[in-house]
From Swiss-Prot:
Disulfide bonds join C28-C88, C134-C197, C244-C303, C351-C413. Residues 1-105 are annotated as: CH1. SMART domains: IGc1 (SM00407). GO terms for biological process: adaptive immune response; antibacterial humoral response; B cell receptor signaling pathway; defense response to Gram-negative bacterium; innate immune response; pre-B cell allelic exclusion. Constant region of immunoglobulin heavy chains. Immunoglobulins, also known as antibodies, are membrane-bound or secreted glycoproteins produced by B lymphocytes. In the recognition phase of humoral immunity, the membrane-bound immunoglobulins serve as receptors which, upon binding of a specific antigen, trigger the clonal expansion and differentiation of B lymphocytes into immunoglobulins-secreting plasma cells. Secreted immunoglobulins mediate the effector phase of humoral immunity, which results in the elimination of bound antigens. It comes from Homo sapiens. It is linked to Agammaglobulinemia 1, autosomal recessive: A primary immunodeficiency characterized by profoundly low or absent serum antibodies and low or absent circulating B cells due to an early block of B-cell development. Affected individuals develop severe infections in the first years of life. Residues 106-217 are annotated as: CH2. This is Immunoglobulin heavy constant mu. Changing Q370A: Has no effect on IgM BCR assembly. InterPro entries: Ig-like_dom (IPR007110), Ig-like_dom_sf (IPR036179), Ig-like_fold (IPR013783), Ig/MHC_CS (IPR003006), Ig_C1-set (IPR003597), Immune_Resp_Modulators (IPR050380). GO terms for molecular function: antigen binding. Residues 218-323 are annotated as: CH3. Residues 6-102, 111-211, 229-319, 329-430 form the Ig-like domain.
Length: 474
């Protein structure tokens, strides 16, 4: 073929947003060039060099060559949002080319800031103290700063700010929430000091004031949450319950909660009112039972709330998420480590549940055919599988005395998940199976990446100082 200069194309990922990973990869494809002599370089928008590049060998296709280059950028830099693109430059004997490669866009959402104040009788101790609670919700990206002011001056002591957490949601961009509390003296509060929760996010400042002379802000507007039935509740109670939670009610006597089907038909709804909360509000829950088949069909159900404080009814609609792949869990039962048994104190049995989808799973322990009390074991929340996108794993840890284990008592881990043939499977372990792993026949090799790291960390977090060793029978 005749000599020709390359044509350039940007390569960008359509996967997760940069807030989910530590680095962001973008690439550049050079195509249809001859001869096979090409040099890639990368620059930021301001023309400074990017060093973290990776080239791939050129490929001959249809008489001409193609090659790619990749650059890895720290996601915290991309999150700054100062560069919309980076520049891919190519040198070739038949002409130099350059192409702008766009960087992923972060969903930038401001926080909603609310301050919850103590009720009049909420002060205790000597001197009498209580807490102000500040909550920032619905923001992205996760970098945020929360501080407290009293009469405009920063407060240094009595502040506790939790870690930023991702909010649970089915779809849409990942958003975050954070809670901060300030311990206050009753004398300062009744002396009408003005306290301020200040939230700094992406160069913007959000402030919410609180004082004993302020009337409750309209920010404590009534909120409605429609909660779908969990698989665990369906499995345990054999009923499919829709739950509608209403919060921040100033009075409870005029609230009504009703569930309706997609066709408008009412579903019998039972309502419960809470006791008064620390911020002097009430909450209410409206529950309705439906057929599991109706829920599984994808039918939409709507919760409608009326109250004298609302100018018009509030509505929330839910349905079972569509298109979620079903993957049955693999269940592995790991006996106590020998080092732990040698201490003659307790025995820890671990039930590892891996590779399942959707994330809803139920784990229960049994001894001699009887369910054990939930206080005896700890089950983790389902977490995404590191190596298998869209699948989850969880683990449950049962602690018994070393004497019980050594008597040869058998323990059974029961796992229920909607993808299992009969919705339930179980694994049993006792002293005679020590050194073995009770598991499905397939894929124990794939277990190590997940098991060794997470179980050890989980045990350490529960203050076990012994090393956990997992034995595999060849």
């Amino acid at each position: 073929g005749s000599a020709s200069a390359p044509t350039l194309f940007p390569l960008v990922s359509c996967e997760n947003s940069p807030s989910d990973t530590s680095s962001v990869a973008v690439g550049c494809l050079a195509q249809d060039f001859l001869p096979d002599s090409i040099t890639f370089s990368w620059k930021y928008k301001n023309n400074s060099d990017i060093s973290s590049t990776r080239g791939f060998p050129s490929v001959l296709r249809g008489g001409k060559y193609a090659a790619t280059s990749q650059v890895l950028l720290p996601s915290k830099d991309v999150m700054q949002g100062t560069d919309e693109h980076v520049v891919c430059k190519v040198q070739h004997p038949n002409g130099n080319k350059e192409k702008n490669v766009p960087l992923p866009v972060i969903a930038e959402l401001p926080p909603k800031v609310s301050v919850f104040v103590p009720p009049r009788d909420g002060f205790f101790g000597n001197p009498r103290k209580s807490k102000l609670i500040c909550q920032a919700t619905g923001f992205s990206p996760r970098q945020i700063q929360v501080s407290w002011l009293r009469e405009g001056k920063q407060v240094g002591s009595g502040v506790t700010t939790d870690q930023v957490q991702a909010e649970a949601k089915e779809s849409g961009p990942t958003t975050y929430k954070v809670t901060s509390t300030l311990t206050i003296k009753e004398s300062d509060w009744l002396g009408q000091s003005m306290f301020t929760c200040r939230v700094d996010h992406r160069g913007l400042t959000f402030q919410q004031n609180a004082s004993s002379m302020c009337v409750p802000d309209q920010d404590t507007a009534i909120r409605v949450f429609a909660i779908p039935p969990s698989f665990a509740s369906i499995f345990l109670t054999k009923s499919t319950k829709l739950t509608c939670l209403v919060t921040d009610l100033t009075t409870y006597d005029s609230v009504t909660i009703s569930w309706t089907r997609q066709n408008g038909e009412a579903v019998k709804t039972h309502t419960n009112i809470s006791e008064s909360h620390p911020n002097a509000t009430f909450s209410a829950v409206g529950e309705a039972s439906i057929c599991e088949d109706d829920w599984n069909s994808g039918e939409r159900f709507t919760c409608t709330v009326t109250h004298t404080d609302l100018p018009s009814p509030l509505k929330q609609t839910i349905s079972r998420p569509k298109g979620v792949a079903l993957h049955r869990p693999d269940v592995y039962l790991l006996p106590p480590a020998r080092e732990q048994l040698n201490l003659r104190e307790s025995a820890t049995i671990t039930c590892l549940v891996t590779g399942f989808s959707p994330a809803d799973v139920f784990v229960q322990w049994m001894q001699r055919g009887q369910p054990l009390s939930p206080e005896k074991y700890v089950t983790s929340a389902p977490m995404p599988e590191p190596q298998a996108p869209g699948r989850y794993f969880a683990h449950s840890i049962l602690t018994v005395s070393e004497e019980e284990w050594n008597t040869g008592e058998t323990y059974t881990c029961v796992v229920a998940h909607e993808a299992l043939p009969n919705r339930v499977t179980e694994r049993t372990v006792d002293k005679s199976t020590e050194g073995e792993v009770s598991a499905d026949e397939e894929g124990f090799e794939n277990l190590w990446a997940t098991a060794s790291t997470f179980i050890v960390l989980f045990l350490l977090s529960l203050f076990y100082s012994t090393t956990v060793t997992l034995f595999k029978v060849k």
